[in-house]
A protein has these predicted regions:
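Intrinsically disordered, low-complexity polar/charged tails and linkers
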Residues: 9-150, 156-158, 164-187
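Short, small-residue-biased leader/transition segments that mark boundaries at the very start
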Residues: 1-7
Length: 187
């Protein structure tokens, strides 16, 4: 199935995870901003408040609808922990905030190095489902359908994977790109 990637193990590094949760209850943002330290709230600039956690180092966006979006985590566990810590702190202000809520991973951004330079013009000509406009952006955009991820390929051999919901999808996306580039003698 993967004749080329067995030659070496592609090291995938998670750069950022975006997760969300809905606590099913409206939140009075002014109360939260006054009660918690590390909160930025300016309704004219942004409809939610930004709460920065030190451990794990993340930022949570809190909206009056009760929806939270956490960004900046480097692992799924840290992402979930950040949301749980944020909700626990909010519960000290509003004890009616439910203890049960679902956390969804929305996006994983990961990077890898293919250990080989790429001729992006040749890749754009040979590889399907790509966009390459070097005047607009130095990377080549490669869209995969399985797994459903978008890869940014750079001439240096660096790759950024976005849109993954799991670490394994990010890794599989990079491996499939490597295999396809190998099949076409582009790497």
């Amino acid at each position: 199935l993967f004749p080329y990637t067995t030659l070496f193990d592609l090291d995938i590094k998670i750069e950022n995870i975006v997760a969300s949760a809905s606590i099913g209850k409206d939140i009075v943002l002014t109360e939260v901003s006054e009660a918690l330290e590390g909160v930025n709230f300016n309704r004219e600039q942004f409809p939610g408040l930004v709460f920065k956690l030190k451990d794990p180092k993340t930022a949570a966006l809190i909206f009056s609808s009760g929806k939270l979006v956490c960004t900046g985590a480097k692992s799924i566990d840290d992402s979930k922990l950040a949301i749980k810590k944020t909700v626990d702190l909010m519960r000290t202000i509003d004890t009616e905030i439910p203890h049960e809520f679902e956390i969804k991973i929305q996006n994983i951004v990961a990077s890898a190095n293919l250990e080989s330079t790429l001729n992006l013009e040749a890749v754009a000509l040979e590889l399907e489902d790509t966009e390459y406009e070097p005047e607009q952006f130095p990377g080549l955009v490669y869209r995969l359908s399985d797994p459903k991820v978008v890869l940014l390929l750079f001439g240096s051999g660096k790759v950024v994977c976005t849109g993954a919901k799991t670490r394994s999808d990010a890794k599989l996306g990079v491996e499939r790109a490597y295999d396809r580039l190998s099949e076409l003698d582009l790497i």
